[in-house]
Amino acid sequence: MAQRTRLGDLLRPLNSEYGKVVPGWGTTPLMGVFMGLFLVFLLIILQIYNSSLILNGFTVTWGG
């Protein structure tokens, strides 16, 4: 038998929506926007690392 704890009682409302699916697209478009922004961020970091994005007054040296 499961033991009831004060922490479990506090966290129970967070788990009450488990298994329920909101009809329609829900927050999928918002997730797509954030994925796109993350992709742009990664591309900028890659271009800085490759030195293909030139930043005036900013030198990058990878040697130790």
From Swiss-Prot:
Topological type in the membrane: Single-pass membrane protein
Pfam families, per the entry: PsbH
Compartments it resides in: Cellular thylakoid membrane
Alphabetical GO biological process terms: photosynthesis; protein stabilization
An example Gene Ontology CC term for this record: photosystem II
SUPFAM superfamilies: Photosystem II 10 kDa phosphoprotein PsbH (SSF161025)
Entry GO MF terms: phosphate ion binding
Superkingdom, taxonomy of origin: Bacteria
Stored PANTHER family: PHOTOSYSTEM II REACTION CENTER PROTEIN H
Family from the record: Belongs to the PsbH family.
Subunit structure, interactors included: PSII is composed of 1 copy each of membrane proteins PsbA, PsbB, PsbC, PsbD, PsbE, PsbF, PsbH, PsbI, PsbJ, PsbK, PsbL, PsbM, PsbT, PsbX, PsbY, PsbZ, Psb30/Ycf12, peripheral proteins PsbO, CyanoQ (PsbQ), PsbU, PsbV and a large number of cofactors. It forms dimeric complexes.
Protein name from the UniProt record: Photosystem II reaction center protein H
Species: Crocosphaera subtropica (strain ATCC 51142 / BH68) (Cyanothece sp. (strain ATCC 51142))
Lineage of the species this protein comes from: Bacteria, Bacillati, Cyanobacteriota, Cyanophyceae, Oscillatoriophycideae
